[in-house]
Each structure stands twice: as structure tokens, then as C-alpha cells.
A protein has these predicted regions:
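Local beta-strand/beta-hairpin segments that build beta-sheet-rich folds
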Residues: 155-159, 166-168, 179-181, 192, ...
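Solvent-exposed loop/turn segments at secondary-structure junctions
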Residues: 2-4, 79-80, 215-217, 234-238, ...
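Short alpha-beta junction capping motif
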Residues: 208-250, 325-334, 352-355
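Soluble or luminal CAZymes and related metallo-dependent hydrolases
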Residues: 48-55, 312-314, 344, 348
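Beta-strand-rich binding/interaction modules
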Residues: 128-173, 179-189
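Substrate-binding clefts and catalytic carboxylate motifs of secreted carbohydrate-active enzymes
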Residues: 1-146, 304
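Catalytic beta-strand/loop cores that center a nucleophilic Ser/Cys/Thr
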Residues: 234-239, 249-344
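Low-complexity, Pro/Ser/Thr- and charge-rich linker/hinge segments at domain boundaries
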Residues: 195-215
Length: 361
């Protein structure tokens, strides 16, 4: 269970004051400087760590919500500097917190009693949110006939609230008119747990936006001018995306897989697509079907909207979504599969086309 690679904090070198020399961290730091990404170290740690915490939560809850399951085992929650450098911890090698999650937050999903909300993560606003409420209870004193206190918030507003002994709830979503992220809070006898649910409204696609899908079309717009979306067919030296990061170590199991992503979530391109700085499950299928390209070698100034966090054995500054101007053209390079038939893909396409067709671009 777990063992998701978190980008190593190479600045821990100064904490090694004994007999062990952190030659691995020293090599990684030199490689980062060589690839001109060392200044992004803190962002890389936070983004990859945020993803690792989300996945640990999902893994642990999957075990807890499985009937008659005998529990779970974690190899460790700290980094392991042996076996090719496995920086897989929520704690560093000195067993100190990386600041990714607090003790109380971790206990919400890995404690003696854990409220569970069994539901999908992605919905359309024409759907009804069907969820099962449950309680994993391994405490010394069992909670008989638990009362589930459920609150669903849309931003700061309460969207739905109930206190019930029933194990199932049905929540219509048709009052939601703009794609949004809902926060779910479930509390039982002082034990609390939280989740995020994404609801996508009917989307508007701007069909008059130019899509560049070939080198010939790209050369033409650069020469003659205009603005357009450049699709992944034009990405040179493509780097395949992935929501799930490298397992254990990219040295032990060679991989070009990234370790998360950093999103400019205040960018106007996301006016109609709910997101925060680091990806949640609304990005899973999108990232799994995406490609990026090495923006450090790109001609012209590049403004990344989404930047993937490379693994420390690769350190390529890659992006699946960025803006640039080349020649007379203003271009949005998009490595996502915009033809996908699922709500989050359609909504991303809608948000992107509306942005490109506006004076914001």
C-alpha cells in the first residue's frame, strides 16, 4: 500500500551531521541545478506531497470500506534513502513532518474510528448523488446505532445537510448551474472525515475556435498570424502524462512518470472549470490521457498554465497546457485529449474554447 514518490528535499543535506554522507541528495541537487529547476524545489515537494497524501487516503479508505477486510499495513511513512533513494514518506528520513498533512488530518482517515462516504467523485448536474454512509469502528468502545451528521458545502454555502441513522442518501444536483467542487463533511460521535465531489454543468463549446492539428497548419498561422489551440498532435518529443506518480523510486524502477502537477488555478482559462493549485480526482482521466513537452527547449517565451512535477531522475520541465507567441501567432498548446466523452473533459474543452475566444487570451 502506498509508496508514492514525493520529490526529495535536497536542502536536507545540511541536517546530515554524522557519519552518513547524503551523496544521493547531493547528486539530485546538482542535477536540478543543471536542468534549471532547483528554484522550483518547494513547489515540487508540496505538489508531489499533496498527491501522495490524497492517494494514501484513498488506499486506506479502500481497505476500511471493504467488508470483512482484516486491516492494512503500511511499510513506513518516512523516506528510505536506501534501495535507489525512495523518498516515499509523509515524514522525512529524520522522522520529521514535511508539512504535507497534520496529525489530526491524517487521523481522520487512519484512526480507531473512521466515517466513510461511499460515492463517485465525478457527477453531471443532471445526476443524483447516491452515497452510502458507513463507519469503520475499531475503537475500544463500539459506537452502536451511529448517527451520521452529513454536510455538503458549495463554497461557503451549505448545499445539503442531514443528521440520520440511515446508511444511504440521495442528493439531487439539478440546482447546480455552474460547474463546481463540493466539500463533503461526515461526522460521527466526534470523528470526522472529508472529501471533494465535482459536479459539471452543461457545457458551451465555442465551435469557431481554430484547432491546429498538423505541422503545416502550425507553420501557416505562425507566418500569417492569428490565435488558436495547438493540439497534442503537434507536440514534439511528447512526454506522456499520468495522475499516479512513480512507485518507490524512479532509479529503482526507471520511469519518466511525473510526480504530480502545479496548476495556475487563478488563470482565467479555469473560469468554468473547478480546480485548485494541485490536481484532485477531476484531473485523473485528463492527466492519464495527456501528453506534455519540454518547455525549457521551446522557442519563444512560454507561460505554463499547468506544469508537471518531474521525478528526480528525469527533472524535465514539462507542461501539457501553456501559452506562447511565435511569429505573428498567439497560441495555446494543449496536450489533453479534448475529444474524450466524459464530463470533466467536455467541461475543460468548454472552458478552454471560451477563454481562447475571448479578449482575455
Amino acid at each position: 500500500m502506498g509508496q508514492y514518490c514525493v520529490y526529495p528535499d535536497v536542502d536536507l543535506i545540511e541536517k546530515y551531521t554524522g557519519n552518513i554522507l547524503p551523496v544521493n541528495l547531493d547528486a539530485i541537487k546538482k542535477f536540478m541545478i543543471e536542468k534549471n529547476v532547483y528554484h522550483k524545489l518547494n513547489d515540487y515537494i508540496k505538489a508531489s506531497g499533496d498527491l501522495a497524501v490524497k492517494l494514501y487516503k484513498e488506499d486506506i479508505e479502500a481497505a476500511l470500506r471493504t467488508k470483512d477486510f482484516g486491516g492494512f499495513e503500511l511499510l513506513s511513512l518516512s523516506d528510505y534513502t536506501g534501495q535507489s533513494t525512495a523518498t516515499v514518506g509523509i515524514l522525512d528520513v529524520f522522522y520529521e513532518s514535511k508539512g504535507l498533512i497534520s496529525h489530526d488530518e491524517f487521523k481522520n482517515f487512519a484512526g480507531e474510528a473512521v466515517p466513510l462516504f461511499k460515492a463517485k467523485r465525478i457527477f453531471k448536474n443532471t445526476d443524483t448523488l447516491e452515497a452510502e454512509l458507513d463507519l469503520y469502528d475499531f475503537g475500544e468502545k463500539k459506537i452502536n446505532n451511529p448517527v451520521y451528521n452529513l454536510t455538503v458545502q458549495n463554497g461557503k454555502q451549505v448545499f445539503y445537510k442531514t443528521s440520520t441513522t440511515e446508511s444511504k442518501v440521495s442528493i439531487p444536483l439539478n440546482s447546480i448551474t455552474k460547474s463546481t467542487m463540493l466539500s463533503v463533511i461526515l461526522e460521527v460521535n466526534g470523528y470526522k472525515n472529508t472529501w471533494r465531489i465535482f459536479v459539471f454543468a452543461e457545457n458551451k463549446i465555442e465551435n469557431n475556435v481554430r484547432m491546429i492539428k498538423s505541422e503545416e497548419e502550425l507553420d501557416d498561422i505562425i507566418k500569417n498570424g492569428g490565435k488558436a489551440i495547438v493540439t497534442k498532435e503537434c507536440f514534439k518529443n511528447p512526454i506522456h502524462g499520468s495522475f499516479i506518480p512513480v512507485f518507490w523510486s524512479p532509479v529503482h524502477f526507471p520511469s519518466q512518470k511525473p510526480c504530480g502537477a502545479i496548476i495556475d488555478n487563478n488563470h482565467r482559462i479555469f473560469d468554468d472549470f473547478p480546480t485548485e493549485k494541485y490536481p484532485d480526482y477531476q484531473w485523473k482521466r485528463l492527466l492519464d490521457n495527456s501528453i506534455g513537452t519540454d518547455i525549457s527547449k521551446f522557442a519563444g517565451e512560454v507561460k505554463p498554465i499547468i506544469e508537471t512535477v518531474p521525478n528526480f531522475f528525469d527533472n524535465t520541465a514539462s507542461s501539457p497546457l501553456f501559452e506562447t507567441e511565435i511569429g505573428k501567432a498567439k497560441l495555446l498548446f494543449c496536450g489533453f485529449d479534448l475529444d474524450g466523452d466524459y464530463p470533466e473533459c467536455k467541461q475543460l474543452l468548454s472552458s478552454i474554447t471560451q477563454y481562447v475566444n475571448s479578449d482575455k487570451f
